[in-house]
């Protein structure tokens, strides 16, 4: 994790929040500079969340960690985090809000959200991958308005390409003709494991692949955990199963709700790197229960019960 801090004289605070993979390359760039009103023409300022439409990738939230809000005058950090979650989950690219006059630590808390990369990165896991962010720019104007601009992880062109490919795979694997939900998932699980290898070079910055995204998983044959989980999450959405991504400092995997029960899937660990280079598929982390996962007692699969309190 790296943090860059720059400060110039001027009128406006300019925060950049960056999310990459999990929490490894978050950057804070705090700049004071002039900020002209004509830059704000495309920003939404509303008093009620229903005044703006959600995009089609809005995801129901079951976590108590954050919630959709129609209060865009936050008075504390919890309410501030809810504003960011609401903007992200609704798919809004630009948005404006005001901190309540009593909220004297507002700017410090915005900076804190930038420094504490986990908070907004955890929010990303509760979103549809298409609504997740790669960076968030927050501009503070001297009239007290904070303008948010979101750079999404996936471009519209990539979304269209991924959606088409997932539909092609579903047809090729005859997923819709399989009765069992677990079997549908297994067939897709095996297909993705077969066409991919783990991109070990991504961690040292030498990779030439988009392995942290579904683009790398579906088209380049190289993935890391975020690429596997995004791809599986999008597939589970396609077959209308409620699902989320789970993350900690080191790793991310999927959970899916089937017939009222939550099951964990770690496609990354089911597609292991072998000494011989042989491509093998395992099922050690395929649709296992929370007690089964916890019985393995692995640090890489620890997760916050506060954030994922809905998983039993």
Predicted region positions:
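Secondary-structure boundary elements
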Residues: 155-217
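Hydrophobic/aromatic-rich core segments of domains that either
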Residues: 227-293
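Sec-dependent N-terminal signal peptides of Gram-positive bacterial secreted proteins and lipoproteins
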Residues: 2-22
């Amino acid at each position: 994790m790296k943090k860059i801090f720059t400060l110039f004289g001027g009128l406006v605070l300019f925060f950049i929040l960056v999310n990459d993979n999990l929490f490894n390359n978050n950057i804070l760039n705090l700049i004071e500079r002039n900020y002209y009103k004509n830059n704000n023409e495309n920003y939404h300022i509303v008093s009620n969340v229903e005044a703006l439409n959600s995009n089609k990738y809005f995801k129901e939230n079951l976590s108590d960690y954050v919630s959709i809000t129609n209060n865009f005058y936050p008075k504390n950090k919890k309410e501030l985090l809810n504003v960011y979650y609401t903007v992200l989950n609704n798919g809004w690219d630009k948005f404006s809000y005001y901190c309540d006059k009593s909220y004297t630590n507002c700017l410090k808390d915005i900076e804190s959200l930038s420094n504490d990369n986990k908070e907004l990165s955890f929010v990303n896991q509760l979103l549809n991958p298409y609504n997740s962010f790669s960076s968030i720019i927050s501009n503070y104007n001297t009239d007290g308005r904070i303008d948010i601009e979101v750079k999404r992880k996936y471009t519209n062109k990539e979304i269209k390409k991924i959606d088409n490919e997932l539909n092609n795979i579903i047809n090729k694997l005859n997923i819709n003709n399989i009765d069992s939900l677990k079997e549908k998932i297994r067939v897709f699980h095996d297909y993705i494991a077969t066409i991919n290898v783990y991109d070990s070079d991504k961690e040292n910055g030498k990779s030439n692949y988009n392995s942290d995204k579904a683009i790398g998983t579906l088209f380049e044959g190289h993935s890391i955990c975020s690429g596997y989980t995004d791809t599986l999450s999008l597939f589970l959405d396609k077959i209308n199963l409620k699902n989320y991504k789970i993350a900690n400092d080191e790793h991310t995997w999927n959970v899916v709700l089937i017939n009222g029960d939550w099951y964990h899937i770690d496609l990354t660990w089911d597609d292991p790197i072998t000494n011989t280079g042989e491509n093998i598929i395992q099922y050690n982390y395929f649709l296992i229960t929370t007690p089964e996962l916890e019985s393995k007692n692995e640090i890489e699969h620890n997760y916050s019960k506060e954030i994922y309190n809905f998983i039993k």
